[in-house]
Regions:
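Short, aromatic- and glycine-rich surface loops/edge beta-strands on solvent-exposed regions
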Residues: 4-10, 249-250, 278-284
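Active-site-adjacent structural segments surrounding the nucleophilic cysteine of cysteine proteases
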Residues: 9-95, 159-165, 221
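Extended low-complexity, serine/threonine- and proline-enriched intrinsically disordered segments
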Residues: 232-265
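Aromatic sugar-binding surface patches on proteins
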Residues: 266-283
Length: 284
């Protein structure tokens, strides 16, 4: 086998806090890669469909990876929002959510065995055979972009079309126009050409593992006639959003539909008032 040695140096400017290493991930790329196709399989897995246009636009197109990671976890019953994943894995140095290592670490914080890997078709087929969807990096053209760009998609299966005697892959493309258009297929020959080899594998969460997923605090709303806005209230105490608040304030109106996950709901952005409250969108 191949051995690897890592050195981690921890430091903090807060003399009252002891720095601690909670999760460590490492990835390597082989110098020589004998790509293999493996044996064709015919299996389709369920993977929730999330698209960029329905979620927080402040992260930009880098939001594709948090969308796919949320889908990978939610298929195992996690019910995490892509925005929660994005805030966990955001690279504070660049403000980007496109770092695959941070994505794997975010899933690890939620209790899921997750790792980056360079995979070929054989590896991907083995993952699908084992019942596990995979995040894959595809080079493709995006509307409005002249040059091909990398897009993270969710691989959810392989199939065969008897009519044309061709194999195909089943993908979830978060850059689609709507949630209903996320599911797509691609011929295996085309997939092999556009797939970069970068992948993120995720396995079901063990029952006995400790997780550190985002904390959710149930609050109520109270209306202020004086300020003409709504405020969050926690146990009767008004909670004001600070001026430097950098999160995403959004509401999800009841639409009478039983959604598979919370992330399937339609969220509408809310306006933060100068007093630290909210205003709902005009249509609400």
């Amino acid at each position: 086998g191949t051995g690897v040695q890592l050195q981690v140096n921890l430091s903090t400017k807060n003399d009252k806090v002891t720095p601690a290493l909670r999760l460590l991930a490492a990835a390597v790329r082989p110098l020589a890669w004998d790509k293999q196709s493996g044996h064709p399989i015919n299996r389709r897995l369920y993977l929730p469909e999330y698209c960029l246009s329905a979620h927080d636009p402040s992260f930009g197109r880098d939001m594709d990876l948090p969308l796919v990671m949320a889908a990978l976890m939610n298929r195992w019953g996690e019910d995490i929002l892509p925005e929660e994943v994005a805030h966990i894995m955001a690279d504070k140095a660049t403000g980007s959510t496109g770092n695959a290592a941070f994505a794997a670490a975010a899933a690890g914080c939620c209790g899921y065995p997750c790792w980056q890997a360079w995979m070929d078709l054989k590896d991907l087929r083995e993952q699908i055979h084992d019942g596990c969807s995979v995040a894959v990096r595809i080079e493709r053209r995006i509307r409005g972009q002249r040059d091909p760009v990398g897009v993270w998609m969710g691989l959810r299966g392989f199939g065969h079309d008897d009519a044309v005697l061709a194999d195909f892959v089943l993908l979830n493309d978060p850059t689609a126009d709507s949630d209903g258009a996320v599911n797509c297929t691609m011929a295996v020959t085309d997939f092999a050409r556009y797939f970069t080899g970068r992948a993120i594998a995720l396995r079901p969460k063990p029952r006995d593992i400790e997780a550190d997923r985002p904390r959710r605090v149930p609050c109520s709303f109270e209306y202020s006639t004086e300020d003409d806005c709504w405020y969050l209230s926690l146990r009767g105490q008004r909670q004001l959003l600070p001026a430097e608040f950098s999160g995403w304030a959004a509401c999800s109106p009841h639409d009478g539909v039983a959604h598979a996950t919370t992330a399937h709901r339609t969220f509408r952005r809310m306006e933060r008032t100068r007093t630290g409250g909210f205003r709902f969108p005009p249509e609400q």
